[in-house]
């Protein structure tokens, strides 16, 4: 089975109006009980299964269901547990103040392959040829997390833009108009 199902295969209960896939419900068993929530577009992959088993969560797939879609609640729950554990672990025990800041997780897998390739080309990232989208997204996200950012300057510029309803780009176009006149 490849995770896709037909309309006839997906009839595992009464159709729910909110479910995007013909009334499918979440394929997970949470604490011994089947999740009644409507399935979203997130699927229960081997990677998700591995992270669930590593985190010792009480989630399992229902073997009677013919699809692998999970609800948005469980998708967010799994992601939040994964991100919390990542932030808590550090080399120096996590007591330093720089580890207390909440680092947002950017999901670059949502980008198109061409965009990821353009990013790779722009920053001249060294990779082996023929990477698939997941490998390319992982390489790009590793680089993206390590880009130094001057937070003070960025915040000051943002506040300036909000207060003045302008940006530096607007100023450049105005100065070029003045030169033409």
Curated annotation (Swiss-Prot):
Compartments it resides in: Nucleus, Nucleolus
GO cellular component: histone deacetylase complex; nucleolus
Region feature Disordered, mapped onto this chain: 82-103
Keywords: Disulfide bond, DNA-binding, Lipid-binding, Metal-binding, Nucleus, Repressor, Transcription, Transcription regulation, Zinc, Zinc-finger
Spans annotated as Important for DNA and phosphoinositide binding: 85-87
UniProt keyword Aminoacyl-tRNA synthetase present: no
Motif window: Nuclear localization signal (NLS): 83-88
Residues passing through the membrane, by range: none
One of the protein's GO biological processes: negative regulation of transcription by RNA polymerase II
Disulphide connectivity of cysteines: 26-27, 35-71
Primary location group: nucleus
GO molecular function: DNA binding; histone binding; non-sequence-specific DNA binding, bending; nucleosome binding; phosphatidylinositol-3-phosphate binding; phosphatidylinositol-4-phosphate binding; phosphatidylinositol-5-phosphate binding; transcription coregulator activity
The keyword Cell wall biogenesis/degradation is annotated on this UniProt entry: no
Annotated zinc fingers (Atypical), start-end: 26-74
Family affiliation: Belongs to the SAP30 family.
Alphabetized PANTHER family for the sequence: HISTONE DEACETYLASE COMPLEX SUBUNIT SAP30L (PTHR13286:SF5), SAP30 (PTHR13286)
Quaternary structure annotation from Swiss-Prot or TrEMBL: Interacts with components of the histone deacetylase complex sin3a, hdac1 and hdac2. Binds histones and nucleosomes.
Comment block on domains: The zinc-finger domain mediates direct interaction with DNA and phosphoinositol phosphates (phosphoinositol 3-phosphate, phosphoinositol 4-phosphate and phosphoinositol 5-phosphate). In vitro oxydation causes reversible disulfide bond formation between Cys residues in the zinc-finger domain and reversible loss of zinc ion binding.
Protein name: Histone deacetylase complex subunit SAP30L-A
Organism: Xenopus laevis (African clawed frog)
């Amino acid at each position: 089975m490849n995770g896709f199902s037909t309309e006839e295969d997906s009839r595992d209960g009464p159709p729910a109006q909110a479910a995007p896939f013909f009334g499918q419900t979440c394929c997970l068993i949470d604490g011994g009980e089947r999740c009644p929530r409507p399935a979203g577009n997130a699927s229960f992959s081997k990677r998700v299964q591995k992270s669930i088993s590593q985190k010792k969560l009480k989630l399992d797939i229902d073997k009677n269901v013919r699809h692998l879609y999970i609800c948005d609640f469980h998708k967010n729950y799994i992601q939040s547990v994964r991100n919390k554990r990542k932030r808590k672990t550090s080399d120096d025990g996590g007591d330093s103040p720089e580890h207390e800041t909440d680092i947002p997780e950017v999901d670059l897998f949502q980008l198109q392959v061409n965009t990821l390739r353009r990013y790779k080309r722009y920053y001249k990232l060294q990779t082996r040829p023929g990477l698939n989208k997941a490998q390319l997204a992982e390489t790009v996200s590793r680089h993206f997390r390590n880009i130094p950012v001057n937070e003070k300057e960025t915040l000051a510029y943002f506040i300036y833009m909000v207060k003045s309803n302008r940006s530096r780009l607007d100023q450049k176009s105005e100065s070029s108009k003045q030169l033409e006149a």
